[in-house]
Each structure stands twice: as structure tokens, then as C-alpha cells.
Amino acid sequence: DKPIRTEESLEGTVIYKKTTTFEVDGYTYQCDVDDGSQFVTLYNKENKLTYKDIVYKATGKIYIGSWNEKKVIEYNSSMSWQEDFIVDQAFTKAMADELGKREFTITMLLSPDTGKVMEVNFNFTTFSPYARVPLHVYREIEVKLKEQIHFKPGEVGKQLNYIMLSWRQKPQGKLPPLPPPGSLM
């Protein structure tokens, strides 16, 4: 008996185990691995801010946020929901099941002028199942976040060279489409 639905699962081997550049389908991603911690930073090679400090545009001084200061963005619950939805939908249900309860980190770098997503990067370890997720999944998340997400920069956010928003998520995955009624697979 064949399964009724087939869908992509995680790769059998670790994809992101050492510092490497990946060129796939017209886009280039950089995977940086810290040899000691095995911590992975995965990002579009075109990114320019991944390792840049957040600074005040006027002074060049490094920005150090605090819980009691004015907001860098105006919170928008529908945008936060949309971020989670985009991540969930990029993973198949089979992938999500294989990931178990483990989370990975998604970081968006926003324009201080428009609040739109300029860059995205991902963090996980070489020994987590996220190191076996195909590159096109991370690419889909990046593209959709850039297309669909924007926040209103706050008073402080407007003064910075970029705004960083980061969160950890355990993807739920999407179900594959059902076959048309009456068809047999």
C-alpha cells in the first residue's frame, strides 16, 4: 500500500555543517558555522547588515536597547501573526513532525524609514534537525517576509541604521493539498 499523501521531509544528512556558500536556482546563500559552538547563521549572500552593529545614524554610537525606553517599532499583532504563518507554511507537516518541539531563530532587519523587511537570517545548530532543512524552505520564508511584513518604526527606530526583530519558532507545517474528489492516487 502506498501512502495517500506524499510530501517532502527533511534531508537525510546535515546540509549546514561547515561554512559554505550555496548557489541554487539563481540565489546565493551563505552558511557561517562557528567551529566551537556549532552555531549556524544562514543568510542571503546579498545581505549587508548581518554582522553590522545597530547604531544611531546621527552619532554612529552603538544602540543598546532597554526595556523601559521608547519602542523601536509600533507593535502590530496582525504582522506578528503573519510572520508566524509564513514560517509555518514554508514547512511541510512531515518536516514539522520531524522537527519535534525544537525551535529555530528567525531575524528580520527592517528599514528605519519604511519599516519593511530588508534582510532575513536564520540561526540553529549543526546538530539540530534545522541543519537538514532544504535551502528552498529558508528562501521561501525570506522572500515572503520581505513581501508581506512591515512595521511602523517608532521614535527610536527612526534614528537607527536598521531595526532588528527576532523570534524563536517551532513550525507547525502545512498539510499537503487533498486530491480532487473522486480521484485515486
At which residue positions do the language-model features occur?
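Charge-biased low-complexity segments
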Residues: 2-185
